[in-house]
Amino acid sequence: MPEKMSLRLVPHLACIIFILEIQFRIADSNDPCPHNQGIDEDIAESILGDWPANVDLTSVKRSHKCYVTCILQYYNIVTTSGEIFLDKYYDTGVIDELAVAPKINRCRYEFRMETDYCSRIFAIFNCLRQEILTKS
C-alpha cells in the first residue's frame, strides 16, 4: 500500500518542483542587480542628481535602466516587486508628500503596461524627475 501511495504522489511532487523552479526563475529575472556587492554612493548620487531633461527612453540601454533601478533599491526607494517607498523622506520633510504623491501615481499609471521591470522602474523615475525638473 505505501508503494502505491508514493507512486501517486510523484506527479504532484513533480508539479510542485516545476512551479517552484519557475517562481525562482521569475524572481531572479526581476532582480536587476543579483551580483551587486554594493553601490558607489558618489556615482549613484551623480547619476540621480544630474538627471538630463527630455530623456528618450528608447535610447537608454537596458543595462543603464537596471543600474538606476539597482540604485533605487539600494536606497530602499523601490522594492523588487516594484513598490515605491518614500515614507522615510515624507516623514523627515525631505519630500512634500502632498505635492509628490499625485505625480508618482500619474507616472506609475502612465507606465503600468511596461512589462520589463527595469524599464518600468526607470520610466517611472524618469517621469517623476521630469516633473520635478520642469517645475524647478
Curated annotation (Swiss-Prot):
Annotated keywords: Disulfide bond, Olfaction, Sensory transduction, Signal, Transport
Bilayer-spanning residue ranges: none
Cystine connections: 33-70, 66-118, 107-127
Record's GO cellular component terms: extracellular region; extracellular space
GO biological process, one term: response to odorant
Result of altering residue 87 to N: In strain: Canton-S, KY02010G20, KY02073G20 and KY02013G20
Pfam families per UniProt: PBP_GOBP
Signal peptide (from-to): 1-29
GO MF term (any one): odorant binding
Database matches in InterPro entries: PBP/GOBP (IPR006170), PBP_GOBP_sf (IPR036728)
Family stated for the protein in its record: Belongs to the PBP/GOBP family.
Function: Present in the aqueous fluid surrounding olfactory sensory dendrites and are thought to aid in the capture and transport of hydrophobic odorants into and through this fluid.
Protein name: General odorant-binding protein 57d
Natural source organism: Drosophila melanogaster (Fruit fly)
